[in-house]
């Protein structure tokens, strides 16, 4: 395992200096699952949720969150995002969320992709909690990333 880049020689946290890194195209894809009762899944499918369409609200919230990641996560660089897409798909267990975030920058967008699906999942919870207090947000993870010094990453199927 390599050295942590956010820790300086004195052992305190710091924002990584990316000044000397080249600008490259970066992409990150993250996902999460929102587990809910079959009755709640049916309500989402049939547009019978009290606060409106949770899938559309989640997509918008995820896009907005990706753009504000540097304000939420300490030491993240503010990045000029070139694209953010959040998809919400109804499954038999609940909702599968996936975000894709890209930029041309000196550092990656993994945190932006993870933040997008995290906030999208929280939004679905908020929009459906009146119907189901037992909703679970699970399997938040990076699926793949491209670009940058550390190379590409692709999660292997389980």
Task: Identify the meaning behind each predicted range.
Residues 1-55, 60-77, 81-158:
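C-terminal binding/interaction regions
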């Amino acid at each position: 395992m390599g050295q942590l880049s956010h820790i300086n020689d004195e052992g305190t946290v710091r924002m990584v200096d990316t000044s000397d890194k080249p600008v490259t195209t970066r992409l990150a894809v993250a996902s999460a699952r929102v587990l809910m009762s079959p009755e709640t899944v049916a309500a989402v499918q049939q547009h019978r949720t009290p606060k409106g369409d949770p899938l559309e609200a989640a997509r918008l919230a995820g896009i907005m969150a990706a753009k504000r990641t540097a304000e939420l996560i300490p030491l993240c660089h503010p990045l000029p995002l070139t694209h953010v897409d959040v998809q919400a798909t109804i499954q038999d267990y609940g909702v599968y969320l996936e975000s894709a975030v890209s930029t041309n920058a000196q550092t990656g967008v993994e945190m932006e992709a993870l933040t997008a699906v995290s906030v999208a999942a929280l939004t679905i919870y908020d929009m459906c909690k009146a119907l189901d207090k037992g909703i679970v947000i699970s399997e938040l993870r990076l699926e793949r990333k491209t670009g940058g010094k550390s190379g590409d990453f692709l999660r292997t199927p389980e």
